[in-house]
């Protein structure tokens, strides 16, 4: 790998610090895929996960497509995604591609789960380090390098106002948006920066608490709530909810739940 690519940790998003309307930012879909840094050197392409683990063999068709880019060397950042029957990015459907290790398993996963590499940044090209350039300039160069709607595509974005994109994500039950400062350089991780901020869609629904299960360690007294929902008048089990419960909430639940017990019959 090149000096820049060696041990590279991709730029990471902060979890707060941006608004949906900001003339200094552009807005992209928050993808439900897997982060991949791709390096092209001559006719060779190397793909790496965010943690540096090699991914070239897992997505060989993407590597082949990148090898055809009309430039001797380039370093790109993006996400590999697959789509469900409704055309939405699906991490669950992508999982077999991520976890397959043996050559036969990789081939089977490739045949059953087609993927696309959606590129949103260009870190280097033609022997030139581009990380110090403003994001909008890097994207301008990227759009000239990657064209069309094949296996490798540029992720679209909207400038100044991300509210319509956010509303679309919420309506379609997508992950949310990423708000990026137009003039920001590419800041190599692992430190998170408010130059890029995730704005996740909040989702809510009504459920009936059916009971709870014990946890482990500090959460031994209450690990998760068991919840259900009414479907055509019938109460159906929907699963467990445990994340997001603070210690204070758990204490309150343990105090109140016994008084709500009912006999099943």
Name the predicted role of every residue range.
Residues 1-265:
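Catalytic cores of nucleic-acid ligases and guanylyltransferases
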